[in-house]
């Protein structure tokens, strides 16, 4: 829309649709995007990778042709995804989208929480520096104990089993020679400048289990093992996507450490455990989160999006 020679940016209404794996987020998001003339931003730590289509349950080419999706097929297998990258991609999507509504859809709620709360500016490192730091951390017999020795305040905020956050804290220490808590004090978080309305799907446990079992069978019938085999022979074995559910079990099968039946059972079981963690995270980590069945959430999003309130 042009006014007096200036390009007036379309005001964006950001709506997040969260939920555990197998809860029906993708199907509902396609339905909502069609009804609301919206576009979709994929908040998924696996769909962001090229060539991982079956394991990530990526939207079909037909769905993507009808509705614009952002943050799909952005990374190569040997590249890393993280919250700052998703924030950059979300801001890019907001900038280029011509639609009034952008649906943020996915199961990687941890990244959304990080974006909402704000991200501290991280030290800029060259590829060589990253490799050197990774080697330093790899030599530690107990990274958490080491973090505790250099920065008790930071260690107190991190659970001993939270290897991801421990690793991130140690990266900052080795990159800056500064205790992470001091670094964050000097580089405070900047909360996200745009309001995001939050909705999450809740699904009865037995129905979710059936969905996940069916989804696993479909993935295997669609060629999951063949997809992973092609990638595992091409890329470094420690690449981030190879740790994901559906991928790591397929690798064990390819290494003849699981039978086909055990592979199916392992993917189903691990996806159920993930779904439980995702549910708990969504319900405990977000304020003002509307939780309901698919029909309840659909109705609430339609009502909200047609209201005059932005954000």
UniProtKB/Swiss-Prot annotation:
Q: Which cofactor does it need?
A: Mg(2+)
Q: What is this protein called?
A: tRNA dimethylallyltransferase
EC top class, as a word: transferase
Give the lineage: Bacteria, Pseudomonadati, Campylobacterota, Epsilonproteobacteria, Campylobacterales
Q: Which NCBIfam families match?
A: miaA (TIGR00174)
State the species of origin: Helicobacter pylori (strain ATCC 700392 / 26695) (Campylobacter pylori)
Q: Where is this site: Interaction with substrate tRNA?
A: 108
Which residues make up the binding site for substrate? 21-26
**What's the catalysed reaction?**
adenosine(37) in tRNA + dimethylallyl diphosphate = N(6)-dimethylallyladenosine(37) in tRNA + diphosphate
Biological role: Catalyzes the transfer of a dimethylallyl group onto the adenine at position 37 in tRNAs that read codons beginning with uridine, leading to the formation of N6-(dimethylallyl)adenosine (i(6)A).
